[in-house]
Amino acid sequence: MSVIVSNTTPINYLVLIDHIAVLPQLYARVIIPQAVLEELQDEGTPVKVKVWMAAHPAWLEVRTVVVPLGASLAVLDAGEREAIGLAQELAADALIIDEPAGRVEAQRQGVRVIGTLRVLYDAAAAGLCDLAQAYERLKHTTFRAHPDLYRAFLDMHSQRRD
C-alpha cells in the first residue's frame, strides 16, 4: 500500500505506545484531514500526543477535504467524516480507522479499512516491531478491542513465521 488516510484514534495510540514511526516505513504517504489534526490537538488529547503533533514530522501530511461530504456521514464525528471523505477523494489504498460506526460507514462508501491492530500486525510482519509486545503496550492504554481479535492477529503472525 502506498497511500493511506488515518483517523484520529490510530495516530493517538501509535504515538502513545511509541510505534508511530512504523507508518512511514509501511506506507509511502500518510495523510490526515484537518479535523483529525484538530482532534489530535484538542484539550482532552494526551499530552504526549499533543507534543508529538505540535512538531509532527514531514511524512504526516495534513490535507483539507475539497469534495463535499455526503449526508450519510453526518452521524459521525468530524474526524471520521473528513477521514472517510479524504480517503474517497484521494482514492487512498486504505483508511486506518478503529471506531465501529466509522468503519461500517467507510466500507459502505467503498473505502478499504484497516485498524490499529492490523497496522501493528503488518509492522511486525515487516520486522519493524514485536507484535506481542506492541499489543501488550496497547492493552495498557484506553484502546479497546476484543481479546479474540488480538489473539487472531497473534495466531496469524505465529503461523506466518512458521
Q: For the regions a protein language model found, what residue spans apply to each?
A:
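Short alpha-helix plus adjacent loop in nuclease-associated cores
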Residues: 114-125
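Active-site-proximal, substrate-binding regions of enzyme catalytic domains
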Residues: 2-94, 100, 107-111, 133, ...
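Residue-level signal for short amphipathic helical patches enriched in basic/charged
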Residues: 97, 126
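C-terminal structural segments of small proteins and small subunits
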Residues: 139-141
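Positions that flank functional sites
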Residues: 102-103, 121
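Short, glycine-/small-residue-rich phosphate/pyrophosphate-handling segment
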Residues: 144-145
